[in-house]
Amino acid sequence: MSGVVFPGQAPVDLDIYQSSYMIDYKPYGKHKYARVTSEVQAKLDTQLRDKEFYRPTPSPNPKLEDGYPAFKRPHMTAKDLGQPGFFPPQGRVGPVEDEWRFTSTCPSVYPASHALYLAHGDPNRIQQSADFPCLLEPEHQPAPDVGKGYFLLPGCACTYHCTVKVPILNRWGPLMPFYQ
């Protein structure tokens, strides 16, 4: 009775219908598979092995539109997070007398020395030094193609930069226009 086909049934093509108990089913017959030579099979095996052990290197400059996994790099440091004072410069390049110069192009600049800074004005102000530059100056802004999707918080407490508008991140879409 196993080979009998009833009138309401049609013969089942096993290449089309494969159920879960036919996991190991391999079709046999001259039209069911393509012949592969041993050289081609070895080449395909090496390609597959390279693909299995290939670890894609993440971009060194992740963007926000790439999604959160772009920021899971194991080699991300505080420099990548934009905290320039976390790693003070290793060696001074200029002469020693340049050390006490004003280090910012901001209209409300602070001297690099703490004593000069206290003599300069309000002690409640944030100290601006070479290790903590003002992030709103043009040289610290990202390039137009790199900075897409980012916004920098103000790094300077001066009145000039407090009037600068900061883009607000819209939760349901892209960055909203600048407003205050």
From Swiss-Prot:
A GO BP entry: flagellated sperm motility
InterPro entries: SPMIP9
Compartments in which it is found: Nucleus; Cytoplasm; Cytoplasm, Cytoskeleton, Flagellum axoneme
GO CC entries: axonemal A tubule inner sheath; cytoplasm; nucleus; sperm flagellum
Tree of life domain: Eukaryota
Keywords for the protein's UniProt record, in alphabetical order: Cell projection, Cilium, Cytoplasm, Cytoskeleton, Flagellum, Nucleus
Keyword check for Hydrolase: no
PANTHER family in UniProt: TESTIS-EXPRESSED SEQUENCE 37 PROTEIN
Subunit structure: Microtubule inner protein component of sperm flagellar doublet microtubules.
Record's function text: Microtubule inner protein (MIP) part of the dynein-decorated doublet microtubules (DMTs) in flagella axoneme.
Protein name: Protein SPMIP9
Gene that produces this protein: SPMIP9
